[in-house]
Regions:
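Beta-propeller blade termini and top-face loops
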Residues: 1-529
C-alpha cells in the first residue's frame, strides 16, 4: 500500500501467493479500480510498494514470483508517473559492487519472496534514487535509481558485512531531529544505521522481552530454569533466577522438552522438519547439545522421517510420575507419532497413518501423553478428529470430537487422567465451542467452553494437583483462562499478564505456580501459593 500523485496504490494476490497479483488504484481509499501493468503483475505473487513521501510521482515495487514458480525474486520496478507505468530494473542479472559467493547478483529473496520483503525510499533524496532493499539474509542499497547497488548487511559473518538478522519485513528512513536514521525490522528485531547503511546496531532491542515464543519447557529439578523455542531466534535458556535468556541453539526454535525427573536431567530442542537435538545434561550452553544424524536413504533424523515432517516440530514431555527415568518424549510428523526412550538419541514410530483421514495436524502442541502413564497418548488429527492409544501405540482409534458448535481445527489435548481429556481448537472463527471434554477416555465428547473468548486456543493444561481433572488452564490469544468445574465455566485468570497470545503453559506437580509463555511479550510466572 502506498500513496502517489494519482491516489492510493495497493496490490492483491487473490489466491495467496499462488496467483498473479493485481495492482489497484483509488482516489479516496473507498473505490478501487485495476491498473493495467502487465509487466509488473504477470507471474507475480507478492508485491511490496514504496514511495519517498505521500503524493510522490516516483514509486517502487519489489516483486516476488508466484509461489507456483518458486517464490523467488522477480525484480524491482520503478514508476515515474505515480503507478500507471513501470520499468523493470533487472536486479537478478545485476551484480553489486561488493558481490560474494552467496550474492553474485542482487537477487535477495532467496526463494522466500512470500515472506521476506522490504523496500524503502529515502525521503531526503529529492530525485528518489536512494532505495534500500531487504530480502532473506541481506540488504542492499542504490543511490542512482537502481543502476548500481551495494550490499549492506548479512545474517552470516563469513562475508565481512555488518550483521543484521535474516528475514526483512519493514523499514523506514527517518530525518526527525535533523539526524538521518535508517531502521529495518527483521525476525531478529530492529536494526539501526546512523550513517546511511555503512554500520548497524541492534542495541535498541536490549531490554525488550518481545521474542515470539512457540513453546516452553521447565526443568523438573530446577523450576527456575526455562527453555523456549523462538520464531527464527533459536532455542534460548534461562538458567536459574534471572531475567536473561541466553541463546543455546540457533535458527528456528520450535518444540522443547525438559525431563520432569529430579534424578536424571535430559532435554530436547528442535529445528524444522523433525530435526530434534538433545542433551543428556543441563543444556545451559550450545556445546551440550547433540545434533541428530541424518540418514539419506530413509530421509530420517535419528529415526524421525523428515520427508513426512512439518515445518514446526512439536515435543511432548511426560510427567515425573509417568516417566521417572526422564528419558521418554513424544513427537509427530504428518502421519506418524514417535517415541524416544533414550532422550532423543533414537526414535521409533508408535503410530503410522497412510491416508488423509489419519493425518496429524501440524501444530506446536499436537501430541500429548497422560500424566499417569506412558501408554495413553493422543494426537490431533484432521476434521475434528483425534488419534488415541491406551496401550503405548500397539492399537489406535480415531475419534471425532465434533459436537454442535465445534468445527475442529484442534490444536491441543490435555489429559487430566486416563479417562478425562480436553481438546482445544485454534479455529480463528465461525464456531461457539472452543473446548470439548471426554470423561470416558475419548469415546464421547461434550462442549466445555462457556466463558471462553471467541479466539484460538494454543494450549490446554490440566492442573496436575487436581486429581478430579476439573481444573484446566487455556492459553488463548487473549491471555490465560481457567476452569475449576471441568469446563462448565471459564474466566480470565491472574492479574498483570498482558492480554496477548499465550503460546504455552507449565505447572509443576505440586501446583505451586503457573508459567505462561507469550508470542511477543516474554515469559510470565504466577504464584499459586
Amino acid at each position: 500500500l502506498a500513496r502517489t500523485n494519482i491516489g492510493w496504490l495497493a496490490t492483491v494476490a487473490t489466491s495467496g501467493y499462488y496467483a498473479p497479483a493485481t495492482l489497484y488504484s483509488s482516489p479516496d481509499g473507498v473505490t478501487w479500480t485495476p491498473v493495467a501493468a502487465p509487466n509488473l503483475t504477470a507471474g507475480a505473487g507478492r508485491i511490496t510498494l514504496a514511495v519517498g513521501a505521500p503524493g510522490d510521482t516516483v514509486a517502487y515495487a519489489y516483486v516476488a514470483r508466484s509461489c507456483d514458480a518458486g517464490c523467488d525474486q522477480k525484480d524491482l520496478y520503478r514508476s515515474g508517473d505515480g503507478g500507471y507505468s513501470w520499468t523493470a530494473l533487472g536486479l537478478n542479472s545485476k551484480a553489486p559492487s561488493n558481490p560474494n559467493e552467496e550474492n553474485p547478483t542482487m537477487e535477495l529473496m532467496g526463494g522466500q519472496g512470500f515472506y521476506n520483503h522490504m523496500v524503502v525510499v529515502d525521503p531526503s533524496d529529492p530525485s528518489r534514487n536512494t532505495v534500500y532493499l531487504g530480502g532473506q539474509l541481506n540488504t542492499g542499497k542504490t543511490t542512482d535509481g537502481g543502476k548500481t547497488w551495494r550490499l549492506l548487511t548479512n545474517w552470516l559473518g563469513q562475508f565481512g558485512l555488518p550483521y543484521a538478522h535474516a528475514d526483512h519485513h519493514t523499514a523506514v528512513v527517518s530525518t526527525a531531529g535533523g539526524r538521518k536514521r535508517v531502521m529495518i525490522g527483521t525476525d531478529g528485531g530492529l536494526f539501526l544505521s546512523y550513517d546511511e547503511g555503512t554500520s548497524w546496531t541492534d542495541q535498541k532491542n536490549v531490554g525488550l522481552a518481545d521474542h515470539l515464543i512457540y513453546s516452553m519447557a521447565t526443568s523438573g529439578s530446577d523450576p527456575k530454569s526455562v527453555l523456549v523455542g523462538l520464531q527464527d531466534n533459536g532455542t534460548r535458556i534461562r538458567s536459574g533466577n534471572t531475567s536473561v535468556f541466553n541463546q543455546s541453539y540457533g535458527g528456528d526454535g520450535f518444540g522443547v522438552g525438559w525431563s520432569q525427573s529430579t534424578s536424571n536431567v535430559t532435554a530436547l530442542g528442535s529445528y524444522v522438519y523433525g530435526y530434534v537435538y538433545y542433551s543428556q545434561k543441563d543444556p545451559n550452553i550450545q556445546k551440550k547439545w547433540t545434533d541428530p544424524a541424518f540418514d539419506d536413504a530413509t530421509c530420517t533424523y535419528n529415526g524421525i522421517n523428515a520427508c513426512n515432517a512439518y515445518f514446526v516440530t512439536p515435543i511432548a514431555t511426560p510427567s515425573a510420575l509417568a516417566d521417572p527415568g526422564g528419558k521418554t518424549y513424544f513427537t509427530n510428523t504428518a502421519s506418524l507419532v514417535y517415541r524416544t526412550d533414550d532422550a532423543g538419541a533414537s526414535w521409533r514410530p508408535i503410530f503410522s497413518g497412510s491416508t488423509a483421514s489419519t493425518y496429524i495436524r501440524g501444530a506446536s502442541h499436537s501430541v500429548a501423553v497422560s500424566p499417569v502413564d506412558l501408554n495413553h497418548v493422543a494426537a490431533v488429527s484432521t476434521g475434528g478428529r483425534i488419534l488415541l492409544t491406551n496401550d503405548g501405540g500397539a492399537h489406535w482409534v480415531l475419534r471425532s470430537t465434533l459436537v454442535p458448535g465445534h468445527v475442529g481445527f484442534n490444536s491441543s489435548i490435555a489429559w487430566a487422567n486416563n479417562s478425562v481429556l480436553y481438546v482445544a481448537s485454534e479455529n480463528p472463527g465461525g464456531q461457539s465451542v472452543w473446548v470439548v471434554k471426554s470423561t470416558d477416555g475419548g469415546q464421547s465428547w461434550a462442549a466445555a467452553s462457556r466463558g471462553l473468548p471467541n479466539v484460538p486456543i494454543q494450549k490446554l493444561l490440566a492442573a496436575p494437583n487436581d486429581l478430579s481433572g476439573n481444573t484446566v488452564y487455556a492459553a488463548t490469544w487473549l491471555g490465560v483462562y481457567r476452569t475449576t468445574d471441568g469446563g462448565a465455566s471459564w474466566s480470565q485468570f491472574g492479574a498483570g499478564l498482558p492480554t496477548v497470545e499465550v503460546s504455552d503453559l507449565y505447572m509443576p506437580a505440586d501446583g505451586s505456580f503457573l508459567r505462561a509463555s507469550t508470542y511477543g511479550r516474554g515469559v510470565w510466572d504466577l504464584s499459586l501459593r
